[in-house]
Amino acid sequence: MTSTTLKKRIFITGGTGYIGGSILHLMVSRDYTDRFEIAALVRRADDVSRLQNMGIIPVYGSLDDSDLLTEEAQKADIIFNTANCDHQASAAAIVEGLTRRFHEMGKRSVLIHTSGAGVLTDTSSGAGVSPSQDFEVRLWDDADWNTHADIPPYAPHRLVDLEIFKAAHQGVAKTYLMVPPTVFGRGVGPLAERRMSIQIPRLVYQTLLSRRATYVGTGENVWPNVHVADLAELYLLILYETTITQSASP
């Protein structure tokens, strides 16, 4: 058996995008291609050669190619789903591939899925009050499973998240749900360096358009943010914890 066949296979969607492209750049710059076989979904033909030159296996297709996604998920040990947190069909196709892999090969892969903090939003009837004055405010804790399980299915991104939860409940994959708030900063590396966040440029555009910066109410609202480089590092930390440290455990 060659060293290549011993490598764990990573499959990433959104690999030429803002978050996924930043993750890919960090992996390539740190020689992850020596330890992993990395494949990335690409929609544009001109990205195929770019990925090949980086040592990445291009998978030509889109999120609408359900059979392709199922096939790739079935082959992967680790999946980064960073393309679209509202594309339910692609998430279901990936989970189907992981389910087949588990039942046919007895292998439980790792699925790291990108959702968004919009899933925690609620309706507002005005400027609101501070958390200390709001007796119905909910403080979120990653360790509080029951609170997260109670999020209604009509919340933003939630229908897709439930596809990931299904894989976890069935025990066919080890799942991680990434729920970043506003991601800011220029993308990292050649695949993502020309990409920026959605929210911050919109705020800047509105400021330029109205020739003044605006705020809501008294300006005391809290808006969490994370830099795209820090977020990419978190994905790799999960990859490390689920592969390197676990494989070293007795």
Regions found by a protein language model. Give the residues of each.
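N-terminal Rossmann NAD(P)H-binding glycine-rich loop of SDR-like oxidoreductase domains
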Residues: T4-T33
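N-terminal Rossmann-fold cofactor-binding loop
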Residues: A39-D46, S62-L63
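Conserved Rossmann-fold cofactor-binding substructure of NAD(P)-dependent oxidoreductases
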Residues: Q52-I78, D86-S90
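NAD(P)-cofactor binding segment of oxidoreductase domains
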Residues: Q74-L139, Y154-L159, E163
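Conserved beta-loop-beta element that borders a ligand/cofactor-binding pocket
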Residues: D161-E193, P201
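Glycine-rich "substrate-gating" loop/helix at the edge of Rossmann-like oxidoreductase active sites
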Residues: F184-M196, G217-A229
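Glycine/proline-rich active-site loop of Rossmann-fold NAD(P)-dependent oxidoreductases
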Residues: G185-P201, I238-P250
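A conserved pocket-lining segment of Rossmann-fold NAD(P)-dependent short-chain dehydrogenase/reductase
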Residues: R202-V226, L234-I238, T245-S249
